[in-house]
Curated annotation (Swiss-Prot):
Family: Belongs to the CinA family.
Cleaved signal peptide residues: none
One Pfam family per UniProt: MoCF_biosynth
Coiled coil: none
Top-level taxon of origin: Bacteria
Protein name per UniProt: CinA-like protein
NCBIfam families: cinA_nterm, molyb_syn, PRK03673.1
Length: 400
């Protein structure tokens, strides 16, 4: 199998001052192209360290994606490191210099002399175009390894990988068929509980079951070679059966997007009233394009379940909304949820059995509970569901 690695560069990445989203994106993107990364490294803005690791990985990797260090400043050292590792100099790429000058001229700006550095490439480098920025990429062959050097700006990096680097890899190597990856996301059951229930399943050859916990959800993944797809799809039915009512969606689209689509398909508008969740519901649903009407975030206050239910019923009527969803304030370890619908208003009072989790996590969990309440009603299910450390202690229904 082709050995593909990634090298992230930059002091800010090494020291944790920024999150390396490029590495996460590349690992996921290449995995679905049948090119799983075998190693990832990070090095700071130090020429000797860069040269050392380029020479080291050139003896082990078939392909190395180097990210960052192609800018115009003194700490952008990737081109010089590549040239030094190869024992050659930098040469000016005249065509790219003219392209950069045009780029600045069209925007009514004068190109700084320091930008000239971005057109200086190792003598043996293959130029790689950057259609959305001033940092061109390049490729060099060092020992057994084909190295691609890419800009750190995420939008530029992704375009270059998708439209320049992947086609070159397909031309030069015989790439394997992408793996099959079946995913579902659960809410309300712990990772250990799910694993205990699923560990008895017999997996086909080369197939693995993976778990990813990201509070408040657990993602289950069944991954394997394309040759085992039929067996995997049969096994997937058992996985879904075991996960049961805790499954909130399949695939990677996300619950807000699926709810948004269902609301649009059924021509339901939605109004929100949030206290404890502080606008998380509105943020998540608006990003997914949900048909929202008036959304409010109000100060937390103690309410009975009946008060919350009557308030959201009135709010739905006042805003002529199809649906209305409320999350009350968090008082004395208790919280209310209420959903007003054409069929009536359904309300739940819950109790937190632990307070060891941070405020942010508790807000995320409650936002997910509210979304799941809405999902379950849209699917014709009982709206009540529990989380491991949240107990439903009271329910109420108001007739239309």
């Amino acid at each position: 199998m082709l050995k593909v690695e990634m090298l992230s560069t930059g002091d800010e990445v090494l020291h944790g001052q920024i999150v390396d989203t490029n590495a996460a994106w590349l690992a996921d993107f290449f995995f679905h192209q049948g090119l799983p990364l075998s190693r990832r490294n990070t090095v700071g803005d130090n020429l000797d360290d860069l040269v050392t690791i380029l020479r080291e990985r050139s003896q082990h990797a078939d392909v190395l994606i180097v990210n960052g260090g192609l800018g115009p400043t003194s700490d952008d050292l990737s081109a010089l490191a590549a040239a030094t590792a190869k024992g050659e100099g930098l040469v000016l790429h005249e065509a790219w210099l003219k392209e950069m000058e045009r780029y600045f001229h069209e925007r009514g700006r004068v190109m700084a002399p320091s930008n000239r550095k971005q057109a200086e490439l190792p003598a043996s480098a293959e130029f790689i175009n950057n259609p959305v920025g001033t940092a061109c990429g390049f490729a060099v062959q060092l020992n057994r390894c084909l190295m691609f050097f890419t800009p750190g700006v995420p939008s530029e990096f992704k375009v270059m990988v998708e439209h320049e680097i992947l086609p070159r890899l397909r031309e030069r190597f015989s790439l394997p068929q992408p793996p099959v990856c079946l995913r579902l996301t659960t809410f309300g059951r712990s990772e250990s509980d799910l694993a205990q229930s699923l560990d008895t399943l017999q997996l086909p050859p080369g197939v693995t079951m993976g778990y990813r916990s990201s509070m408040p959800i657990i993602e289950l993944k069944l991954t394997g070679p394309a040759s085992e797809q039929q067996a995997m799809e049969k096994l997937w039915l058992d996985v879904k059966r075991v996960a049961g009512q805790s499954v909130i969606f399949e695939g990677t689209e996300g619950l807000p997007a699926q709810i948004s689509r269902e609301l649009q398909n059924r021509q339901f508008s939605l109004t929100l009233s949030e206290q404890f969740t502080g606008g998380l519901l509105a943020l998540q649903l608006s990003r997914a394009g949900a048909p929202l009407l008036a959304c409010e975030v109000v100060p937390s206050q103690e309410e009975t379940l009946a008060q919350t239910a009557h308030w959201i019923t009135e709010r739905r009527a006042n805003h002529f909304a199809g649906l209305a969803l409320a999350v009350s304030g968090f008082e004395n370890e208790h919280l209310n949820f209420a959903l007003a619908t054409p069929d009536g208003t359904f309300a739940l009072r819950v109790r937190f059995s632990t307070t060891r989790y941070s405020l942010a996590i508790r807000q995320e969990v409650c936002a997910m509970m509210a979304l799941n309440m809405l999902r379950r009603w849209l699917n014709g299910q009982d709206i009540a569901s529990e989380h491991g450390w949240i107990e439903v202690i009271e329910s109420m229904t108001l007739s239309v």
